[in-house]
Amino acid sequence: MKTTDKIIIIDLEATCWQGDVPKGQQNEIIEIGLAVLDSQTGVITKNQGILVKPQRSTVSPFCTELTTITQDLLDKNGVSFEEAIEQLTDEYQPDLYTWVSYGQYDLNMLKKQCRSFGVPYPMGDEHINVKVWFAEKFGLQKPTGMNGALHLLNIPLEGTHHRGVDDAKNIAKILDWCLHN
């Protein structure tokens, strides 16, 4: 592991639709949820969500139902993807730390969107898939979703599921269990 004192947790939310992606649109990051876990103490030292204004898609009613994020919220409070990555880099220096996500989606989506927008990929090479690690540590036959892992650990879901800011904090709790069991 690249770092042992703190680990960055990332959970992305992206535009989505019920069924196929509409013509002329593409899945795009609309929230970068972040948490920082002190791996020794288990304390979540930072937790925030960076709202990202989509440039190549719009938030569908299905997406709002899933995430609670509206197009209006992003229009008023979102920043461009480039600004979001700059904020992430300036505030967290993520290339210096091990980072985790729950599943491979966040890693793949972040790399894909950075390539698509011509933005340097901000994360370090050390990535841990907590979904797979938790399944191995807990002795599961196959990985379970974040909600399922929290349930197995008797940890209540905090906040709103499918909000990056809240999911990052919940993933940090699962990661802490993995680190100490």
List PLM regions with ranges.
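Acidic two-metal-ion nuclease catalytic site recognized across multiple nuclease folds
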Residues: 1-2, 150-152, 168-181
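Conserved non-catalytic scaffold segment of RNase H-like nuclease domains
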Residues: 2-115, 124, 147, 151-162
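Active-site flanking residues adjacent to catalytic metal/cofactor-binding acidic residues
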Residues: 10, 128, 166
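Non-catalytic, well-ordered alpha-helical scaffold segments
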Residues: 86, 107-108, 128-131, 169-172
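Active-site catalytic pocket residues across diverse enzymes, especially alpha/beta-hydrolases
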Residues: 114-117, 178-179
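A structural motif
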Residues: 119, 139-151
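Short hydrophobic/aromatic-enriched beta-strand-loop microsegments
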Residues: 120-128
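Short alpha-helix plus adjacent loop in nuclease-associated cores
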Residues: 128-143
